């Protein structure tokens, strides 16, 4: 749906809403541009009021300082899943009034939270260059198979994601990954599997590096954020994604505790969570809708690049927020020592 038509449709949802200034905070970049086109402009055209977009880098401390000082100037903030859980526990966010947002049954289960609404799904996946690798890898076992697929592998320098991928490569079913990794033997098994691949690993730390490695021919496969591969494809690069065993996570909309524009903030969250708005967003960046009804409004080409499409999500693993909150510090310390050897 074009923004102008989306705006017209929203007039029903925002019938007599006073003009107000709403401050919406996100991470900027291509995601921020997609939100501006799909959400901000449509909201303003529908009479919802003026939106001021602010970029940040996920600094929870800024939200905490506002809330504790009772001087809240941010109305809606995009947060990552660990910050959602921590901020909710600390009382930094308003409770979400789902009766004003939408039908919970329409959303992915992970998108429904007492303090937030999942706004998009992103995934860490396996990627390769279709011009350089004619036989497509189909699972993490292929990523580890340097005889069948000779060459370097790009991997994010950290324990997170890599330990999960290692266990899947070693035959652990997706549904059992965190159950196995939570044990001493399971962690040992994951590090042992990583050690097998270590001579062939080229580490990356910035999200822009994996597609650069592929295009330059430095690696034959790499882990990558799906949105980065999508951006390279839009630039004409023939990069491909293997979705099997990808690890997905969500970003969420929250309202800082004490926002003076709570009603307007709820209306914005409801609009940006609607099927039409989320479908428009997904056309501009390949992050998946959390409202399942949005998928019916997208063509096959767009669906094929989304983590939330049925074909791409059927063998995916949801990022274990609780697991990494409990064991992340120890595993990252162990990984750093292992990587330095």
Predicted regions and their residues:
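C-terminal capping/gating helix-and-loop segments adjacent to ligand/active sites or protein-protein/ligand interfaces
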Residues: 279-341
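Periplasmic-binding protein-like
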Residues: 106, 122-124, 148-162, 187-196, 233-259, 272-294, ...
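A ligand-binding cleft/hinge motif common to bilobed small-molecule-binding domains
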Residues: 84-86, 221-238
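Extracytoplasmic ligand-binding site segments that recognize negatively charged/polar headgroups
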Residues: 29-36, 73-74, 79-211, 215
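N-terminal signal peptide c-region/cleavage motif recognized by signal peptidases
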Residues: 13-15
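A bilobed periplasmic-binding-protein/Venus flytrap-type ligand-binding module shared by bacterial periplasmic
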Residues: 125-132, 167-169, 250-264, 271, ...
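Early extracytoplasmic/lumenal segment of secretory-pathway proteins
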Residues: 19-86
């Amino acid at each position: 749906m074009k923004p102008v038509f989306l705006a017209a449709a929203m007039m029903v949802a925002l019938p007599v809403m006073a003009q107000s200034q709403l401050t919406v905070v996100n991470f900027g970049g291509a995601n921020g541009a997609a939100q501006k086109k799909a959400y901000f402009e449509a909201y303003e055209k529908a009479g919802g009021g003026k939106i001021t977009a602010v970029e940040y880098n996920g600094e929870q401390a800024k939200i905490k300082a506002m809330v504790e000082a009772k001087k809240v100037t941010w109305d809606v903030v995009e947060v990552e899943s660990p910050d959602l859980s921590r901020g909710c526990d600390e009382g930094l966010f308003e409770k979400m009034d789902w009766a004003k947002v939408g039908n919970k049954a329409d959303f992915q289960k992970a998108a429904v939270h007492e303090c937030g609404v999942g706004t998009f799904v992103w995934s860490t996946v396996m990627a390769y260059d279709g011009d350089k690798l004619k036989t497509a890898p189909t699972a993490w076992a292929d990523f580890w198979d340097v005889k069948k697929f000779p060459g370097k592998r790009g991997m994010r320098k950290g324990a997170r994601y890599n330990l999960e991928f290692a266990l899947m490569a070693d035959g652990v079913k997706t549904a059992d990954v965190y159950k196995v990794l939570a044990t001493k033997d399971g962690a040992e098994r994951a590090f042992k599997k990583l050690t097998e691949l270590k001579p062939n690993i080229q580490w990356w730390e910035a999200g822009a590096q994996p597609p650069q490695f592929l295009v330059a021919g430095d690696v034959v496969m790499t882990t990558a954020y799906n949105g980065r591969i999508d951006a390279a494809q839009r630039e004409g690069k023939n990069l491909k994604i293997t979705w099997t065993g990808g690890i997905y996570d969500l970003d969420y909309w929250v309202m800082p505790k004490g926002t003076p524009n709570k009603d307007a903030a709820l209306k914005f969250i409801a609009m940006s969570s609607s099927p039409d708005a989320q479908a428009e967003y997904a056309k501009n960046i390949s992050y998946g809708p959390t409202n399942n009804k949005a998928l019916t409004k997208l063509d096959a080409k767009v669906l094929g690049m989304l983590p939330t499409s049925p074909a791409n999500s059927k063998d995916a693993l949801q990022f274990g927020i609780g697991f990494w909150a409990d064991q992340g510090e120890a595993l990252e310390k162990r990984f750093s020592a292992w990587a330095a050897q």
